[in-house]
């Protein structure tokens, strides 16, 4: 198996112990609006199959499964799968060589994956290969000050400093994807926003431009 990430990153994911439970209200507030937007942009409602690449502990996998009939999560770290709320939906696999035939899933999705990869365009090409109807990508926004600060202090996440709306679109187009829309979204942080802060963060999301994450919807 070709390793997605370098040895330092792999050690981090294999040893990390804290992850927010997928069913936490903050996880729902973080995940569901993004899923709703992707479905609207790709013209997909509730009857679709989904592959979540780099699923981690399955936060998005869980919320996709609340909407779609068939969801599969692919993750490199067995440690993360063991800590998942939905381990039955996850399997070990390689983002550079997805173990599925062409056109296997309606939607191929990845969140906070590409900035950890040494060859993100190769991974996007694989996602395009197995997608029938759409590819949906969520990445941290380097132009969001708290996210940029996190990228500076965290060696594992330093790759996020390369990601903006423009750069993510460029990677997707280099991989041959037909980009439909790119937007910024979110003032809730995946594993860092206290649950009590969610109501305030939702109000900020409703009125403030920008956001901590870049969302890209594309056709294969």
What name fits each language-model region?
Residues 1-43:
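Conserved class I S-adenosyl-L-methionine
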Residues 57-97:
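Class I SAM-dependent methyltransferase SAM/SAH-binding core
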Residues 109:
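A conserved beta-strand element that flanks and buttresses the S-adenosyl-L-methionine
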Residues 117-126:
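A short, conserved alpha-helix within the catalytic core of class I
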Residues 133-140:
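Conserved beta-strand signature within the Rossmann-like core of class I S-adenosyl-L-methionine
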Residues 142-158:
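Short, glycine-/aromatic-enriched active-site segment of Class I SAM-dependent methyltransferases
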Residues 160-177, 181-182:
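Short alpha-helix
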Residues 180-220:
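A C-terminal cap/extension of S-adenosyl-L-methionine-dependent methyltransferases
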């Amino acid at each position: 198996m070709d390793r997605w990430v370098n040895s330092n990153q792999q050690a981090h994911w294999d040893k990390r112990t804290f992850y927010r439970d997928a069913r936490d209200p903050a996880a729902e507030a973080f995940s569901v609006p993004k899923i709703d937007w992707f479905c609207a942009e790709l013209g997909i409602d509730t009857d679709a199959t989904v592959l979540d690449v780099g699923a981690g502990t399955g936060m998005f996998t869980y919320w996709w499964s609340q909407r779609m009939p068939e969801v599969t999560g692919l993750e490199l770290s067995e440690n993360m799968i063991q800590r998942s709320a939905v381990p039955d939906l996850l399997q070990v696999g390689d983002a550079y060589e997805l173990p599925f035939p062409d056109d296997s899933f309606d939607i191929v999705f990845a969140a906070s994956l590409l900035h950890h990869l040494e060859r993100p365009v190769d991974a996007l090409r694989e996602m395009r290969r197995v997608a029938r109807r759409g590819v949906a990508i969520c990445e941290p926004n380097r132009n969001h000050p708290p996210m940029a600060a996190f990228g500076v202090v965290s060696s594992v996440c330093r790759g996020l400093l390369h990601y903006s709306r423009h750069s993510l679109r460029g990677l997707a187009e280099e991989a041959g994807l037909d980009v439909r829309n790119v937007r910024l979204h979110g003032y809730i942080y995946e594993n860092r926003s206290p649950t009590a802060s969610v109501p305030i963060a939702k109000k900020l999301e409703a009125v403030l431009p920008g956001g901590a994450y870049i969302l890209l919807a594309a056709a294969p």
